[in-house]
């Protein structure tokens, strides 16, 4: 079994050629980590990185499931029992998405401050609050809307998990594997959305649609298991932790960089579509099945049977999106994705318009059109999620080459800035889900269909395609000077001050290899 401590080689005072091993005990703390050292990576650090990635994925997977509890529960909450309209249910999804988005930036920073393992343990523990609270709430139908809104906001704690887990994965893996690692972390994490929808389907099949609290009860158990696993098997990397007094210049540098905002806009289009459609897809299907004349029970069953397909394919696509971006380039794949999403949104508008002009006719054809177009948007958004996240470390690694730093300091700078940008981009992107919820809610309230909202989505995808082409796809890297200028505008924001003093200075590649070896047990 792999030991959970880092073994460091130091020169023996009796023989310079004979290394001795120093154990760091059972504290789960690693004092030095260099994923770019190929020898150390193959000698054992790869196993440590994989183990940390595994448990990061577990926490983000369960976080997504808790975050997207309400799209499933809404389908299992008949209006005659709980008294909530379709508009009320859209509002629950909007609140959950909004709070999850706002928590992502502080979660990313907290991981850097407190350590990956420490924060992952805490963030898993707090998932028990919405899981238990929602279980209690659903066993007492007839309550007003506001306590449900509070519980929906608390499920946003699961949305914050993503940013900290992605920052952790970014820190443990070498640049050549970041696309794959981030794709796996994001993709398997995103599988938490279809997973809870399948749990909802299982609940309907076994106990009927009137016991939604059983879904929450299951996740209370799963989260408790995750807390134990994370605390036992994850690591803190001391050199990856950032002192609180250094956060201000880091955040200032990130927010004053044009690439941060442009990447956020691109992720707004990809991840915003994924999480937004995940929240509304089941509700849209249920509304259309009811309009076809199906009973509420059958409409609910059919909606739950189909709603998981889109998020499932999107999560799988994200994994392959990261790998494909490693091969063909993140910007090129992102451009292709947005062009295809524009076309898919146009087809969705056609299906919705056909339904509006021929009310009661062609229902079967329009339902097929709805489903196919939504699934296409899900798959494309998953690919785009992987490609945009590949762009982040690539862009800032390229920017670091224009800075007057040693090779080791340059890697530290790139990792710190990329980690914070990942958190900010994740938060900004999730706001796209809020926009999708609000746009569809208003569209259904005013016109009874989602056509107006679909027009907005198509224009946003087209604008994102143009942005990607003009800024990123037409050149190899971004304007290096812009980031450097942002860093040196104020003395407190110089690169050396951003990364701080290094705990271990490396005198040679051989020294790095000797210090950075983890031995398997």
Predicted regions and their residues:
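Extracytoplasmic
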Residues: 51-82, 277-282, 436
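Extracytoplasmic gate region of multi-pass secondary transporters
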Residues: 70-75, 257-315, 382-385, 389-390, ...
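Conserved MFS/SLC helix-loop-helix module at the cytosolic interface between two early adjacent transmembrane helices
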Residues: 102-145
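C-terminal ends and interior cores of transmembrane alpha-helices
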Residues: 125-141, 339-363
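Hydrophobic core of transmembrane alpha-helices in multi-pass small-molecule transporters
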Residues: 144-160, 359-385
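Cytoplasmic helix-loop-helix junction between adjacent transmembrane helices
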Residues: 149-188
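Glycine-rich segments within core transmembrane alpha-helices of 12-TM secondary carriers
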Residues: 159, 179-204, 422-436
């Amino acid at each position: 079994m792999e030991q959970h401590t880092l073994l460091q080689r130091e020169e023996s005072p009796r023989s310079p050629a004979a290394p001795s091993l120093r154990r760091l005990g059972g504290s789960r703390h690693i004092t030095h980590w260099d994923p770019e050292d190929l020898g150390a990576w193959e000698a054992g650090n790869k196993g440590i990185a994989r183990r940390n990635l595994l448990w990061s994925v577990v926490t983000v997977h369960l976080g997504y499931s808790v975050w997207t509890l309400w799209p499933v529960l809404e389908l299992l909450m008949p209006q005659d029992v709980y008294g909530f309209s379709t508009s009320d249910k859209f509002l629950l999804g909007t609140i959950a998405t909004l709070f999850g988005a706002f928590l992502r930036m502080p979660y990313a920073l907290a991981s850097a401050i407190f350590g990956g393992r420490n924060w992952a343990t805490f963030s898993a523990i707090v998932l028990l609050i919405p899981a238990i609270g929602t279980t209690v709430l659903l066993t007492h139908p007839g309550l007003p809307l506001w306590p449900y809104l509070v519980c929906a906001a608390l499920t946003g704690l699961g949305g914050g998990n993503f940013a900290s887990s992605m920052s952790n994965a970014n820190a443990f893996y070498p640049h050549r594997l970041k696309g794959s690692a981030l794709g796996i972390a994001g993709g398997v994490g995103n599988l938490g959305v279809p997973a809870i929808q399948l749990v909802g389907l299982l609940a309907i099949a076994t106990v009927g649609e009137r016991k939604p609290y059983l879904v929450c009860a299951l996740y209370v158990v799963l989260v408790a298991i995750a807390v134990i696993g994370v605390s036992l098997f994850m690591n803190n990397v001391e050199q990856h932790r950032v002192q609180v007094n250094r956060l201000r210049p880091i955040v200032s540098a990130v927010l004053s960089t044009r690439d941060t905002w442009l990447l956020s806009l691109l992720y707004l289009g990809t991840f915003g579509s994924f999480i937004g459609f995940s929240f509304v897809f089941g509700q849209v299907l249920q509304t259309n099945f009811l309009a076809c004349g199906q009973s509420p029970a059958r409409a609910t069953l059919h909606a739950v049977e189909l709603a998981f397909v889109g998020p499932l394919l999107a999560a799988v696509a994200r994994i392959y999106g990261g790998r494909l971006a490693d091969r063909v380039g993140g910007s090129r794949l992102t451009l292709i994705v947005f062009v295809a999403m524009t076309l898919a949104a146009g087809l969705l508008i056609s299906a919705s318009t056909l339904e509006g002009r021929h009310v009661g006719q062609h229902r079967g054809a329009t339902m097929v059109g709805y489903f196919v177009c939504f699934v296409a948007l899900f798959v494309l958004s998953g690919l785009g999620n992987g490609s945009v996240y590949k762009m982040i470390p690539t862009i800032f690694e390229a920017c670091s080459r224009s800075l007057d730093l040693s090779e080791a300091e340059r890697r530290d700078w790139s990792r710190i800035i990329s980690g914070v940008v990942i958190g900010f981009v994740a938060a900004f992107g999730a706001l796209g889900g809020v926009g999708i919820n609000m746009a569809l809610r208003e569209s259904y309230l005013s016109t009874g269909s989602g056509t107006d909202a679909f027009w907005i989505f198509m224009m946003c995808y087209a604008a994102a395609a143009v942005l990607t082409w003009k800024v990123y796809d037409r050149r190899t890297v971004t304007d290096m000077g812009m980031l450097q200028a942002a860093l040196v505008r104020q003395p407190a924001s110089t690169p050396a001050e951003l990364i701080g003093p290094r705990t271990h200075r490396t005198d040679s590649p051989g020294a790095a290899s000797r210090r950075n070896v983890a031995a398997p047990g």
